[in-house]
Amino acid sequence: MNKYRVRLFSVFVVCMILVFCVLGLFLQQLFETSDQRKAEEHIEKEAKYLASLLDAGNLNNQANEKIIKDAGGALDVSASVIDTDGKVLYGSNGRSADSQKVQALVSGHEGILSTTDNKLYYGLSLRSEGEKTGYVLLSASEKSDGLKGELWGMLTASLCTAFIVIVYFYSSMTSRYKRSIESATNVATELSKGNYDARTYGGYIRRSDKLGHAMNSLAIDLMEMTRTQEMQRDRLLTVIENIGSGLIMIDGRGFINLVNRSYAKQFHINPNHMLRRLYHDAFEHEEVIQLVEDIFMTETKKCKLLRLPIKIERRYFEVDGVPIMGPDDEWKGIVLVFHDMTETKKLEQMRKDFVANVSHELKTPITSIKGFTETLLDGAMEDKEALSEFLSIILKESERLQSLVQDLLDLSKIEQQNFTLSIETFEPAKMLGEIETLLKHKADEKGISLHLNVPKDPQYVSGDPYRLKQVFLNLVNNALTYTPEGGSVAINVKPREKDIQIEVADSGIGIQKEEIPRIFERFYRVDKDRSRNSGGTGLGLAIVKHLIEAHEGKIDVTSELGRGTVFTVTLKRAAEKSA
């Protein structure tokens, strides 16, 4: 800004000097012309006056010479009297005179002869009775040098005064413009840095206010645009980072420039290890690399179901690859979306296994019933002993079939979203006492001691008594089933600060550690032969698990092969019994 002011000021100064020089030359010429005209008029009058004083008929008399000498001092001129032959008779400065001017005068050139050496010459003929008797020649110095000095002095003084005035107004004006322009420049600089809160404040010059208003309007518009873009970007990033599917973006050159959180979680990687790397170096799985190359080659959408190894497991991913095209069909890159289908595949497999198990479980009792019925129809009814045995088997298989159907109905009802519990506050000791009474006969038949251990003080839980009775009846019945003769089964109630633990412990055959995670699966049996002989359906523990989870409780299992198993159910504790 300062350099610009210096350049502008220099231009002003040069222009001003040129104007004053031209003006000075013009005035000088004007004054010189006017002064010369006045000098010519003045010397003409003096010459005519002097000629009127001279005695033209007798030029050599002493009176004429005295007049000429007196006139030289009085009129501040040099005067000479010349005869007709061009001889200088006398003069105010003696008999000296410019010979060229004398010759011109004698030749008939009267009036202003010339101006040389800053002198003005004027010649006039003298006549007596109509005859030319001589000449008078006057010369006077021009006084224009003093006038020129005064003129240029005035111009110089005017120039200095004008210079001071111009400098003052120029500095004042440019300072105001400078503040406005510098303010606008600073705002523009801040805007270029991304500081859209910068503003310029006017008031210096009205016209410059328009620039300030324009800059402020631009800043406001840029701020709004930036906020809108940031909001849209944040929304997009939020969506990208929080979608359940993994997402990767590859640019047109094959470099990965976006990896979302879901992908990093799915593949157990650090996103920074993949960013700004070529896809064939970043991806560990050849199937994904081949899919990307196919999209690059064909520029079409691809969708594949891939089974990829991740650490110690294999997971299924439905990978959608979509090419990104610009407005002019310009290739921008690829977006890969990884949908984790592992759970879906597991559910499909569970559904297949469930259908197969249900079919098998239903087929076994139906086959038995059909077989024994056909045997009876073929003539075995005549044998009373065989008839009684076959009918007992048919009854047993029918009861087993009924139990299976009932368990399937219970499991289906529990897994429905609209399944509800009849929650109330009750004392579990009474419910467990009823279970002990129901199963006491079975325990006595096998010679198993069944004990219920409850604290002396009443304890209350919040839950559905009917469903919880179903849970513990199943657990105690299983404990009796898998405990050999002479063993023991104990039901222990252990109150804690915020909940109550109810244990069902037996001294039975136990469960292998690798089988414990699977005992709550549908139709899974630890001892298949014993379970079938006892009439079990394989759905009891699956129902137990779902009912406990519906109560927001927890069930744990600890077991040692050959020494027994402990099922621990944790339920919410209630403060007091409801009225």
UniProtKB/Swiss-Prot annotation:
Residues 357-575 form the Histidine kinase domain. GO terms for biological process: phosphate ion transport; phosphorelay signal transduction system; regulation of DNA-templated transcription. Coiled coil: none annotated. Residues 1-7, 172-579 are cytoplasmic. It comes from the Bacteria. Its main location: membrane. The keyword Protein transport does not apply. The keyword Transmembrane helix applies. Keywords: ATP-binding, Cell membrane, Kinase, Membrane, Nucleotide-binding, Phosphate transport, Phosphoprotein, Transferase, Transmembrane, Transmembrane helix, Transport, Two-component regulatory system. Pfam families: HATPase_c, HisKA, PAS, sCache_like. It catalyses: ATP + protein L-histidine = ADP + protein N-phospho-L-histidine. The chain crosses the membrane at residues 8-28, 151-171. Its EC number is 2.7.13.3. The modification Phosphohistidine is found at H360. SMART domains: HATPase_c (SM00387), HisKA (SM00388), PAS (SM00091). Residues 234-300 form the PAS domain. It is found in: Cell membrane; Membrane raft. SUPFAM superfamilies: ATPase domain of HSP90 chaperone/DNA topoisomerase II/histidine kinase (SSF55874), Homodimeric domain of signal transducing histidine kinase (SSF47384), PYP-like sensor domain (PAS domain) (SSF55785). It is a multi-pass membrane protein. GO terms for molecular function: ATP binding; histidine phosphotransfer kinase activity; phosphorelay sensor kinase activity. Member of the two-component regulatory system PhoP/PhoR involved in the alkaline phosphatase genes regulation. PhoR may function as a membrane-associated protein kinase that phosphorylates PhoP in response to environmental signals. PANTHER family: PHOSPHATE REGULON SENSOR PROTEIN PHOR. This is Alkaline phosphatase synthesis sensor protein PhoR. The lineage of its organism: Bacteria, Bacillati, Bacillota, Bacilli, Bacillales.
